[in-house]
Design a protein with these regions (language model features):
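Sec-dependent signal peptide recognition
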Residues: 2-9
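Hydrophobic h-region of N-terminal signal peptides that target proteins for export
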Residues: 10-18
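Beta-rich carbohydrate-recognition and catalytic domains
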Residues: 20-224, 236-275, 296-340, 377-379, ...
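Beta-rich accessory regions
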Residues: 31-33, 258-277, 283-479
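Short, well-structured alpha-helical interface segments that form or flank functional binding sites
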Residues: 58, 229, 279
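Functional cores that coordinate and move charged inorganic groups
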Residues: 227-235
Length: 479
């Protein structure tokens, strides 16, 4: 009888435990899909996340060109936690979503900021911060579509004493190949210096020390050495090395320099995207024809997960970084309109007839920029009001787009070409391939669409030598 009671009690305990333990279903990777009917305030040629996410950020992450397709990952948070969405494209314009396979159920941790790189054997690999793991991790692609990945391999360096360095906050890594040696960086979001390490096989890492060389010249560069370096991406551009990253205080920025004693010694520093902290978390890849193409996350956009246009970075022999939209975007153009030799009287605004729309590309050419302010109002009403102002501020040597601003040095009489991309509420402006500003003019999904374009001048007449406008097709009509 006692044995029978014991068995009954044991069975009851097992039953209670099973009832209190939640059932875990096998993880089925979701595939985000572009909605059939999107609200009219959604972009149609910027990459955005099309489905619900429980949280931000949406940093662009591992990017590759592999087996005829471009691949880009970005962070979002689904029911499983922080994951890497995966999109691919033949041209960096028309994207399709893959199953979200890089997620906590398959890796054992959340997926946070990192980068992509190729091994010495040409195999795509990713390095990233494992959310909640306090470690950085490496995984290797196991198929041509980048839908299958190896198990995570920890990236943990040893110090000079041969012991693993464990009690360090590991965060925002990057890996690149220089010669026959892999170098890796552990980014920081504090005053602690980012660390650089090296490996011959991606498994055995040796700490070198601080990423930034002791000869870092704060006065020359105009920035403190202690400014945080998050979302780092290091690559060779021309004959120099470039580090793009963010500072949580300053926003997106870049250094140009060289390596000395296996540490990075910058010669130049500037912000990328002006004073905007919304142009965030850069990530780049190398195209088959040798172009370096960069994306950033546009923080706080009307639609979650908005990425900047893919932007080519070039460093010619003059050492000045060139920033331009990729040529592949031209495939979306139609209904070309051209106007030449337009005179805008001082302190007036001129509406452009038949040039209007909220999905446009504009090219504005001014051969003599003079000494007075002028510019373009976009997304304005029929009277040229209530628009987003793009102001060439000659008095302060600034490019101002809405509330955002960036330095724009023009000599007296120097020519200027503005490339302006309007995509629903988004406005992205490139100036002389030297500056980029991205902002938006929010509107509700059912709100009236103001889509006018006007030219203005302040203080003196200005001659607009040429303005070309194209309407832009949707990039989501097919792959």
């Amino acid at each position: 009888m006692k044995k029978k009671n014991i068995l009954i009690i044991a069975a009851l305990i097992v039953s209670i435990c099973n009832a209190q333990t939640p059932k875990t279903e096998p993880y089925v990777p979701e595939t985000p899909l572009w909605p059939k009917n999107t609200p009219n305030n959604w972009p149609i040629y910027h990459l955005v996340h099309p489905t619900f996410s429980y949280d931000s950020p949406f940093d662009p992450n591992p990017a590759f060109f592999y087996k005829g397709r471009y691949h880009l990952h970005y962070i979002y948070k689904n029911e499983a936690g922080f994951s890497f969405a995966h999109v691919s494209s033949k041209d960096m314009v028309h994207w399709k979503w893959h199953p979200t396979v890089l997620a906590p159920p398959t890796t054992g941790h959340g997926m946070f900021s990192g980068t992509g790189f190729f091994t010495k054997d040409g195999q795509p690999a990713i390095v990233y911060c494992g959310w909640s793991s306090k470690r950085n991790w490496i995984q290797y692609a196991l198929d041509d579509d980048l839908n299958k990945w190896s198990k995570p391999q920890v990236m943990l360096p040893k110090g000079k004493d041969g012991k693993f360095i464990e009690n360090v906050p590991y965060f925002d890594p990057d890996i690149w190949l220089n010669g026959n040696t892999y170098y890796g960086v552990n980014g920081v979001s504090s005053d602690d210096p980012p660390q650089i390490m090296k490996s011959e096989n991606l498994k055995d890492w040796i700490l070198i020390g601080d990423l930034l060389h002791p000869d870092f010249d704060e006065k020359k560069l105009g920035v403190k050495k202690s400014e945080d370096i998050s979302c780092p991406n290091m690559f060779k551009l021309g004959k120099k090395w470039v580090l793009v990253c963010i500072s949580h205080r300053l926003g997106c920025r870049y250094f140009i320099g060289d390596f000395k004693d296996e540490q990075f010694l910058p010669e130049y520093h500037a912000l990328l995207g002006g004073n905007s902290k919304r142009y965030f978390a850069p990530e780049s890849l190398l195209t088959p024809d040798g172009r370096r193409v960069n994306w950033t996350w546009f923080h706080g956009g009307e639609v979650q997960g908005t990425q900047s246009l893919p932007t080519e970075l070039e460093l010619p022999s003059d050492g000045i970084l060139r920033i331009r939209p990729i040529k592949e975007l031209q495939s979306l153009r139609y209904d070309k309109q051209t106007r030449k030799k337009l005179i805008v009287k001082k302190d007036t605004s001129v509406m452009l007839e038949k040039i209007k729309g909220d999905h446009l590309e504009l090219k504005v050419v001014v051969k003599d920029t003079g000494e007075h302010n002028f510019g373009v109002d976009v997304l304005c009403d029929e009277q040229g009001r209530e628009g987003l102002r793009i102001n060439v501020n000659r008095e302060k040597n600034l490019l101002e787009v809405g509330d955002e601003k960036a330095p724009l040095m023009l000599k007296k009489g120097q020519a200027l070409t503005l490339r302006i991309f309007i995509d629903a509420t988004l406005v992205e402006v490139f100036a002389n391939e030297r500056q980029i500003i991205m902002t938006d003019k929010p509107r509700g999904a059912e709100a009236r669409i103001n889509d006018g374009v006007a030219l203005f001048s302040q203080g003196k007449d200005i001659k607009i030598d040429k303005i070309i406008a194209w309407k832009m097709k949707s990039a989501y009509a097919g792959d």
